[in-house]
């Protein structure tokens, strides 16, 4: 099956069966899934989070609350969370996150 892409420009939202994206008046968000992953991205206040989940039980939840870009990528069985307040978390399978809101990241090979 083809990847699902949920983009949201300022003031917009987008939803498909495995992804959601929502942006406030000053946010940009993107969620992309394939092969059983789930992803959500929510942005405001000049934040630009991107969530990419590929593979069975891959999950990424991104929240942009401060100015800056953030990315979270999860492979099969991995869970990535970026909340914009604390450092990102990467658990389970192979995953990566980088967050310019907190200047922190995580990596799980």
Protein language model regions, located:
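Feature marks extracellular polysaccharide-active and adherence modules
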Residues: 32-34, 44, 52-54, 63, ...
């Amino acid at each position: 099956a083809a990847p699902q892409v949920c983009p949201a420009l300022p003031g917009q939202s987008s939803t498909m069966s495995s992804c959601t994206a929502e942006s406030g008046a000053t946010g940009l968000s993107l969620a992309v899934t394939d092969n059983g992953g789930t992803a959500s991205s929510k942005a405001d206040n000049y934040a630009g989070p991107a969530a990419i989940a590929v593979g069975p039980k891959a999950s990424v939840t991104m929240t942009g609350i401060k100015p800056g870009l953030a990315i979270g990528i999860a492979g099969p069985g991995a869970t990535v969370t970026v909340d914009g307040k604390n450092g990102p978390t990467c658990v389970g399978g192979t995953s990566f996150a980088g967050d310019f809101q907190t200047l922190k990241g995580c990596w799980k090979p």
